[in-house]
Amino acid sequence: MRPEPEPEAEPGAAAIGGRRAAPAGRPDGGLPGRPGWAPLVPLLCGTFVGTLNNNVLNAPLRLVVASLRVSVSSGALVVVSYPLALAVAMPLAGWYADRVGRKRLFVASVLALCVTSAGASLAPDIAALVAFRVLQGLSSAAILPCVMGLITEIYEPGRRGRALGLWAAANGLGQTVGPPLGGLVASSVGWRFVFVPAIAVGLVAAAGAGADRRVPGGPGHRSRLEVRGAALLTAGTGLVIASAMLVPIVHVASVVAILAAVGVACLALLAFGRREVREPFVDPQLWREPSFLRSSLAAFAQMFCLGTTLLAVPLYLTRSGSLAPASAGLVVFSLPVTMTLLAPVAGVAAERVGPRRVLRSGLGVLALAELALAALAGSTLELPLLVVSLVVAGLGIALVQTPAAAGATRSAVGRVGTGLGLFNSARFAGSALGGAWVAVVLAHAPRYRLGFVVAAAAAAAGLVATFAGPDSPRTSGSRAAVSTGG
């Protein structure tokens, strides 16, 4: 039975995760009155910490593997295990946020991330470090769905686009600071101290959100977990990504192929299996909604390119001692800083020329930038041209991230925790697979050019996906309704 449609959501939101998204005081979402931007600050700090931990070990990775006496391809697990855990756990974390309350789970998740970050800094060997990176990812899996959900609760549609632009900027800032911070700290005092800044900011985020009454702290809504759907989605996502991660490590192709096949079978059974459930974890008809699907595919492609580039470029620059880790981190800095500065501008551009045009422009620019990196990887190192290519890649990512996130939150699927978890799962699955792809191309003779070419192909595939389906209906009179990926 379908509920009545809401002004900013399409009918059917109740069929995801077992409940409808509950407006927080306004018929179109948003708190009563006109809340300022202060409640957003601790949420952005939490977003920053989660993103920072994703790539803080990229630049000093060679120092890490030398310290732990493992190969670079094995050490790449340290990088990709974090987004793998995020991608697997986010849909379930989003569902749980709806059940126990987004604010409560946000604070708990940030504190857990601080604890597991301290554990990672004390890891005695590669196995322990990878395990703590997985725990870091699981701890932070709820942060992004909670933040996006709280933004929709706090801000009405007229201001939600700008809030999501700031959210995208916080994501970019974490990507900006991660490589140079990791390289600088590791070169100065050792790689085990790279998590200390994130712990400090995380404690501030948890304290700020917990103390601010303007951050909605409702108890959540009781709902039953549809175990079959949750298990299929979690197992399918995890097995597909894990199989890609294991390619350079497990030299038995049949093992990897079996894991991948089982993962694909789980996802196919979830998507196409016929089973009447009163409260499905994810209704396949809804998560195939065009607006949500193209936003998720665009975000996946963008993060695949980002994960590939932020891992491959530092390794390329530090090969055979070409550059120190700190210097490599500063070169890579040009990509995320561009992404951070232009994220709010992308929201304005979407309002003026339309979100799908911005998405298409961003993915096209990103594909060209990856091809430029491929060309440079096969020639004599030209740092100025490399920096220009990274800046162009940052421009492309900025033009994708904000409209894709806004489009996901506006769709019926994206108005509940499970849907927000699915969207962010797609993002970090892209990041994990991008890092895994780099491990594959470096497993034997390094083939950096091939790594960037495949990233360009992923961006091109995302571009093709933006032509699927009609535009979503927009609420008249709301400029924010235009700044979406719909």
What are these regions (language model features)?
Residues P145, L166, N171, Q175-G183, ...:
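Glycine/proline-centered helix-kink
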Residues R62-V65, F132, I151-E156, G161, ...:
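Helix-terminus/helix-capping segments at the ends of transmembrane helices and short amphipathic helices
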Residues A118-L122, A206-A211, L267-A271, L371-A375, ...:
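Membrane-embedded alpha-helical segments of multi-pass transporters/permeases
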Residues M1-L52:
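Cytosolic juxtamembrane N-terminal segment immediately preceding the first transmembrane helix
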Residues N58, R62, V115-L122, G172-S187, ...:
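Membrane-embedded alpha-helical segments in integral membrane proteins
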